[in-house]
Protein backbone atom coordinates (compact mmCIF):
# COMPACT_ATOMS: atom_id res chain seq x y z
CA UNK A 1 0.00 0.00 0.00
CA UNK A 2 1.15 3.53 -0.72
CA UNK A 3 2.10 5.83 2.16
CA UNK A 4 2.45 9.44 0.97
CA UNK A 5 5.03 11.68 2.62
CA UNK A 6 4.59 15.14 4.10
CA UNK A 7 1.48 17.00 2.97
CA UNK A 8 0.66 14.61 0.14
CA UNK A 9 -2.49 12.50 -0.20
CA UNK A 10 -3.13 9.29 -2.19
CA UNK A 11 -6.51 9.28 -3.95
CA UNK A 12 -8.57 6.71 -5.86
CA UNK A 13 -10.45 8.57 -8.60
CA UNK A 14 -14.15 7.74 -8.87
CA UNK A 15 -15.96 7.35 -12.18
CA UNK A 16 -17.01 10.72 -13.58
CA UNK A 17 -20.62 11.71 -13.17
CA UNK A 18 -22.68 14.89 -13.40
CA UNK A 19 -23.27 15.17 -9.63
CA UNK A 20 -21.19 15.39 -6.49
CA UNK A 21 -23.03 14.58 -3.28
CA UNK A 22 -26.34 15.31 -4.99
CA UNK A 23 -25.19 18.65 -6.40
CA UNK A 24 -25.27 18.98 -10.18
CA UNK A 25 -21.99 20.41 -11.43
CA UNK A 26 -21.91 22.91 -14.27
CA UNK A 27 -20.24 21.63 -17.44
CA UNK A 28 -17.12 23.73 -16.89
CA UNK A 29 -16.80 22.51 -13.28
CA UNK A 30 -17.00 18.87 -14.42
CA UNK A 31 -14.00 19.43 -16.69
CA UNK A 32 -11.92 21.11 -13.97
CA UNK A 33 -12.65 18.80 -11.03
CA UNK A 34 -13.01 15.13 -10.21
CA UNK A 35 -14.31 13.17 -7.26
CA UNK A 36 -11.97 10.85 -5.39
CA UNK A 37 -11.66 8.80 -2.22
CA UNK A 38 -8.73 9.34 0.15
CA UNK A 39 -6.83 6.05 0.53
CA UNK A 40 -3.83 7.34 2.51
CA UNK A 41 -2.35 10.58 3.84
CA UNK A 42 1.10 11.77 4.73
CA UNK A 43 1.94 12.77 8.29
CA UNK A 44 1.38 16.47 7.54
CA UNK A 45 3.68 19.45 7.16
CA UNK A 46 5.97 21.21 9.62
CA UNK A 47 5.56 24.89 10.38
CA UNK A 48 8.58 27.18 10.55
CA UNK A 49 8.77 26.66 14.32
CA UNK A 50 8.75 22.87 13.94
CA UNK A 51 5.13 22.10 14.85
CA UNK A 52 3.51 19.32 12.81
CA UNK A 53 0.19 20.26 11.19
CA UNK A 54 -1.86 17.13 10.45
CA UNK A 55 -3.75 16.81 7.15
CA UNK A 56 -7.32 18.14 6.99
CA UNK A 57 -8.51 14.96 5.24
CA UNK A 58 -8.47 11.38 6.47
CA UNK A 59 -8.59 7.94 4.90
CA UNK A 60 -12.09 7.23 3.61
CA UNK A 61 -13.07 10.86 2.95
CA UNK A 62 -14.67 11.65 -0.42
CA UNK A 63 -13.13 14.79 -1.88
CA UNK A 64 -13.36 17.13 -4.83
CA UNK A 65 -9.93 17.57 -6.42
CA UNK A 66 -8.51 19.57 -9.32
CA UNK A 67 -8.78 17.43 -12.48
CA UNK A 68 -5.18 17.64 -13.63
CA UNK A 69 -3.49 17.69 -10.22
CA UNK A 70 -0.99 15.17 -8.98
CA UNK A 71 0.90 12.20 -10.32
CA UNK A 72 -0.55 8.91 -11.56
CA UNK A 73 0.85 5.85 -9.77
CA UNK A 74 0.10 2.12 -9.74
CA UNK A 75 0.18 -0.19 -6.74
CA UNK A 76 -0.32 -3.70 -8.07
CA UNK A 77 -3.35 -3.53 -10.36
CA UNK A 78 -4.79 -0.43 -8.66
CA UNK A 79 -4.36 3.08 -10.08
CA UNK A 80 -4.08 6.11 -7.80
CA UNK A 81 -3.04 9.73 -7.94
CA UNK A 82 -0.86 11.44 -5.37
CA UNK A 83 -1.63 15.13 -4.85
CA UNK A 84 -0.60 17.85 -2.48
CA UNK A 85 -3.31 18.61 0.06
CA UNK A 86 -3.62 22.11 -1.45
CA UNK A 87 -5.03 20.51 -4.65
CA UNK A 88 -8.03 19.15 -2.72
CA UNK A 89 -10.84 21.68 -3.05
CA UNK A 90 -13.45 20.26 -0.65
CA UNK A 91 -14.52 17.30 1.46
CA UNK A 92 -17.85 15.89 0.26
CA UNK A 93 -20.06 15.26 3.28
CA UNK A 94 -23.11 13.08 2.77
UniProtKB/Swiss-Prot annotation:
Signal sequence residues: none
PANTHER family: 10 KDA HEAT SHOCK PROTEIN, CO-CHAPERONIN GROES
Similarity comment text for this entry: Belongs to the GroES chaperonin family.
Localization annotation: Cytoplasm
One Pfam match: Cpn10
Record note on quaternary structure: Heptamer of 7 subunits arranged in a ring. Interacts with the chaperonin GroEL.
NCBIfam families xref list: PRK00364.1-4
Record GO biological process: chaperone cofactor-dependent protein refolding
Protein name: Co-chaperonin GroES
Taxonomic superkingdom: Bacteria
